[in-house]
């Protein structure tokens, strides 16, 4: 910057966020949570890199006359110029230069004495050059460089005060600003610089930054002019352009509507850096809220008031699967086909990577049941600005034998249901394709179930995530739920041989549908295992009058689940149609529905559930709807309220935390067969004098466990009889 002999000038550089180099894009990917540098923070960082700003302005003085020889000098000198260079890595160079008409051929001492003996006002200044620490300092000056005052320190000159008589804001050409509102903005930003105030260089420098930080100006140069009334301080500013348009580059997923909303308030107004910063922050926040790898990387103002916004979005370049050893954590060969895992992911190549989407993908892979641990590691894909994803998977043991126990509803004479034992073999990952095979045997005092189940969670080649399940089962369950309480204390069991296939798939978020075809061969047997067709009351045990009923069922089911916890909303609808493929096969239609709704009231939770069903056609008596018991109307034994062709059961529960995993609960239940008990073949409920409707109420405790909630409850029915109930899991 060229110097003038009649002013003191500060110049500041305009600030621009530079476009990232490939190396900086690499840094962008490694620091996912970093935000773009704003104009204000960039200016602040630049200010921190300044060591000092130096200028020598000394008050006029009139020393007593001395008899010394002096050269022909002007009566007034104000020839100091200060220049400030701001750069990313360049040193800061400050110099103070004085142009004089001294006869420098005289000796050094004589010149010093001459300066001290001036009777006219004189501003003395030194020539200094400052660089960053640890950098070499070089000073190359011409013949006019003054070197006498090397002892002046930076801090001392910065703290010297100069009386300012007037403070003005002007254009860079010294003219008045056309827009007075901008002039007022600049004046309002000043803190120290006021008329008739003594200022230091540091205070002037700080006010320069305040004007820049107001956001309306791209440059500000303080100029000191000596007038007859004193020193006038002018801030020569260059306002920003008016905002006339916006160009956004590389924003593939950022909605254009969101960009327009972020910048809408600034159209037609002078560009304000602070408002641009707010817009950039909102855009970066949009990416962060969605977990997207995106950031505003550059912003620039073009001619005509066009703002150019550049966005860096990290697209997925490649996705790979890496299996890790369960014990050592080292890479190993996995048993699962990588394609089986990759097709579970919603993240695809070419998409902008989302951490939230990646978390959902991790949860999906864990839900397959074959992985012990899953994590996603994003890595830069070279200098392409894209990202490679590595999914680390630790596999669980694929299969084995297990044994356990459970609760059966077969024994109803005591407060607790009978215990059953189980033995099973399962394979979670057949052929490395996440296919499941389960062979189990459950045995109780009366109950017994042998089941073979094969499930393919996702049929290969299907893009709708359709699953297939094939089941073969042989079961024996107590018949006393419908045909119990026989006077001779005899008991009977219902034997069923079932085989079927079902297909399930999600068809909407939180909605799942199932369709299947099931064949059933069922009949009743006495305690010795002999087939029987009538009970003690001569009520038929089969619909066909034969020892066994055979049915081909076509099944349709739709289930809605909310968040999945026990207090969330749930709705299920099921319809089964008996197909008379052969004349003796049963033909009927059965419809059932269940709904549950939870409401949180402070720490407590209110849960309301409702279930019901109806059967039309010819069906087996033991297939009637059973009312009463732990999962129906508490306070009654299993099936003690009634059994009918139709039913409705409602329940209300208020649960509240007690301590840790323990909850207390207060409940009431009501159930009715809607007068349909007599329409069941043989009217087994009427023969046993079941009321057909009833209610119960009580209280209990629940404990969370790996098996699900353990429920211990005590309830009274409408006959004032009390009964304990114990159950595992949520009520049906």
Curated annotation (Swiss-Prot):
Null allele phenotype: Embryo lethality at the globular stage.
Keyword Isomerase listed: no
Biological process according to GO: chloroplast organization
Low complexity composition bias: residue spans: 11-20
Gene3D superfamilies (UniProt xref): membrane protein fhac (3.10.20.310), membrane protein fhac: a member of the omp85/tpsb transporter family (2.40.160.50)
Cystine crosslinks: none
Region (Disordered): 1-23, 135-154
Gene Ontology CC annotations of this record: chloroplast; chloroplast envelope; chloroplast outer membrane; plastid
Entry annotated with the keyword Chloroplast: yes
Keywords: Chloroplast, Membrane, Plastid, Plastid outer membrane
Record-annotated POTRA domain positions: 314-396
Cellular localization per UniProt: Plastid, Chloroplast outer membrane
Pfam family, one: Omp85
Family: Belongs to the OEP80 (TC 1.B.33.2) family.
Role: Plays an essential role during early stages of plastid development.
Domain remark in the UniProt entry: The N-terminal domain (1-52) is not required for import, membrane integration or activity.
Further comment: Probably not processed upon targeting to chloroplasts. The targeting is independent of the general import pathway.
Protein name (record): Outer envelope protein 80, chloroplastic
The species this protein was found in: Arabidopsis thaliana (Mouse-ear cress)
Protein's gene: OEP80
């Amino acid at each position: 910057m060229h110097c003038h002999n009649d002013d003191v000038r500060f110049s500041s550089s305009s600030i621009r966020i530079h476009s990232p180099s490939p190396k900086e894009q690499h840094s962008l990917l490694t620091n996912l949570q970093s935000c773009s540098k704003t104009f204000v923070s960039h200016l602040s960082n630049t200010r921190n890199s300044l060591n000092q700003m130096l200028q020598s302005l000394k008050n006029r003085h009139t020393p007593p006359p001395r008899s010394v020889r002096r050269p022909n000098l002007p009566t007034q000198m104000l020839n100091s110029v200060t220049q400030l260079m701001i750069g990313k890595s360049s040193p800061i160079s400050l110099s103070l230069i004085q142009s004089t008409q001294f006869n420098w051929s005289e000796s050094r001492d004589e010149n010093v004495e001459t300066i001290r003996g001036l009777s006219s006002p004189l501003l003395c200044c030194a020539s200094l050059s400052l660089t960053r620490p640890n950098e070499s300092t070089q000073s190359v000056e011409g013949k006019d460089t003054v070197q006498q005052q090397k002892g002046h320190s930076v801090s001392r000159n910065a703290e010297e005060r100069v009386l300012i008589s007037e403070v003005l804001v002007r254009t860079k050409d010294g003219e008045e600003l056309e827009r007075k509102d901008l002039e007022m903005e600049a004046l309002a930003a000043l803190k120290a610089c006021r008329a008739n105030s003594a200022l230091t260089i540091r205070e002037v420098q700080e006010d320069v930054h305040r004007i820049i930080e107001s956001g309306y100006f791209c440059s500000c140069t303080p100029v000191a002019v000596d007038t007859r009334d004193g020193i006038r301080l002018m801030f020569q500013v260059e306002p920003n352009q008016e905002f006339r348009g916006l160009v956004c580059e590389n924003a593939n997923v950022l909605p254009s509507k969101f960009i327009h909303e972020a910048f809408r308030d600034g159209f037609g107004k002078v560009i304000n850096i602070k408002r641009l910063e707010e817009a950039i922050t909102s855009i970066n926040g949009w990416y962060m809220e969605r977990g997207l790898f995106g950031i505003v990387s550059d912003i620039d103002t073009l001619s005509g008031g066009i703002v150019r916004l550049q966005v860096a979005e990290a697209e997925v370049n490649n996705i790979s699967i890496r299996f890790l050893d369960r014990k050592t954590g080292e890479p190993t060969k996995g048993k699962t086909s990588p394609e089986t895992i990759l097709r579970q992911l919603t993240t695809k190549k070419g998409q902008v990577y989302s951490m939230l989407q990646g978390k959902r993908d991790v949860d999906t892979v864990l839900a397959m049941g074959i992985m012990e641990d899953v994590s996603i590691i994003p890595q830069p894909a070279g200098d392409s600005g894209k990202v490679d994803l590595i999914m680390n998977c630790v596999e669980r043991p694929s299969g084995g034998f297990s044994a356990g126990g459970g609760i059966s509803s077969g024994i109803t004479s005591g407060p607790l249901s009978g215990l059953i034992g189980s033995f099973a073999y399962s394979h979670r990952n057949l052929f490395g394709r996440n296919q499941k095979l389960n062979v189990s045997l459950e045995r109780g005092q009366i109950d017994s179930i042998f089941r073979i189940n094969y499930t393919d969670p996702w049929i290969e080649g299907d893009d709708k995530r359709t699953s297939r399940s094939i089941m073969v089962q042989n079961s024996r369950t107590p018949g006393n739920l419908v045909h119990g309480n026989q006077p001779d204390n005899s008991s009977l069991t219902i034997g069923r041989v079932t085989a079927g296939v079902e297909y399930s798939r999600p068809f909407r978020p939180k909605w799942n549908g199932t369709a299947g075809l099931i064949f059933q061969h069922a009949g009743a047997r006495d305690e010795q295992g002999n087939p029987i067709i009538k009970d003690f009351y001569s009520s038929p045990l089969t619909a066909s009058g034969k020892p066994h009923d055979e049915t081909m069922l076509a099944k349709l089911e739709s289930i809605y689940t909310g968040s999945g916890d026990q207090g969330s909303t749930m709705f299920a609808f099921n319809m089964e149609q008996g197909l008379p493929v052969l004349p003796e096969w049963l033909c009927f239609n059965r419809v059932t529905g269940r709904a549950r709704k939870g409401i949180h009231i402070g720490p407590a939770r209110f849960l309301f559930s409702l279930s019901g069903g109806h059967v039309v056609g010819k069906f087996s008596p033991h297939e009637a709807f059973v009312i009463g018991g732990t999962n129906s109307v508490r306070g009654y034994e299993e099936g003690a309220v009634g059994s009918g062709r139709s039913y409705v059961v409602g329940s209300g529960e208020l649960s509240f935390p007690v301590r840790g995993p323990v909850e207390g609960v207060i409940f009431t239940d009501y159930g009715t067969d809607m007068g349909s008990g007599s329409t069941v073949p043989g009217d087994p409920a009427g023969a046993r004098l079941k009321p057909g409707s009833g209610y119960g109420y009580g209280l209990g405790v629940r404990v969370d466990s790996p098996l699900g909630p353990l429920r211990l409850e005590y309830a009274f029915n409408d006959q004032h009889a009390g009964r304990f109930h114990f159950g595992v899991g949520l009520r049906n």
